Amino acid sequence: MTFKRLALTISLFASASLGHAQSNELNIYSARHYQTDEALYADFTKASGIRINRVDSDDAGILARLKAEGTASAADVILLVDAARLWRGEHDGLFQGVQSTVLEQAIPVQLRSTPDASGKTAWFGFSTRARVIVYDKVRVRKEDVDTYEELGEPKNKGKVCIRSGSHPYNLSLFGAVTEHLGEQQAEQWLRGVVANLARPPKGGDTDQIRGVASGECAIAVTNSYYLARLMHSSKAEDKAVVDKVGVVFPNQSSWGTHVNIAGGAVARYAKNPTNAVKFLEYLASPEAQNHFANGNNEWPTAKGVAINNPALKAMTGGTFKSETVPVSQIGKNQIKVQQMLDRVGFK
């Protein structure tokens, strides 16, 4: 059952199917549509005895549903895949704050929400995905795409492929650039990116990588795990794509590469809040963190967790410098970013 197939008018009835409040249950609304997460849920149930009931949608659909359901919502845990949407859920009053020493010690402060006056935290990031630059190793020199700023420079005119500017992955990147450069300079940069497009924005991140390999463009912006999936693939056509492209983790000499998060929160009207916190604490454990790394090619957020994913290690040697700006601040920049996109004509 997915929200994409359900109208909001029947959401209250669908909520009932998730089960009533019981001490051995947990109801999750999840935007993580990854088959590999099934092992994550199974391991939690095996360790805790808590049965998981889950409904899948996208970030926007989940937030809309929570608003529509109000106090009748069955949701205990909310899992979203974008920092800006987590920020929006917090500021729309859809989450309840959590005090957990386990989570506070495990998750870096910049990858969770700012605590409220009572010291409670609304959401935590449990994995990161880097927004990287992929380039044609024949047509482009690596030193010409070492920074995000270079995406907007004249030397790269007609070379850039990127998905829609209003997609959450790009909104978060643009929000980060705005935080680092300031609004005026960020808008000038966006104008430069638009001027450098090889074609109008279309498709998903994998399409951008394939566009570089096919020669449609020479530079693309993508989340790191899309490239990692191609690197893990046994298909000849995917191997050919990987052979043709190089990857850059931008701004290693300045503020670091932008990372977005997948994170979780306890729903405001959770009927099983204790189980919800147990689940969030489980997501910060080494076992769960390695599920994210090995199952979906994401980087763990918990401190001190070692990973053993060949594709991630091949990209970076296992580590890279990421930005330290709080992801909650990036969410606050979303309105500014959308206005800038409208002004520069970035569709």
Q: Residues of each region from the PLM?
A:
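A structural signal for short loop-to-beta-strand junctions that line the ligand-binding cleft
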Residues: 73-78, 96-133, 149, 160-162
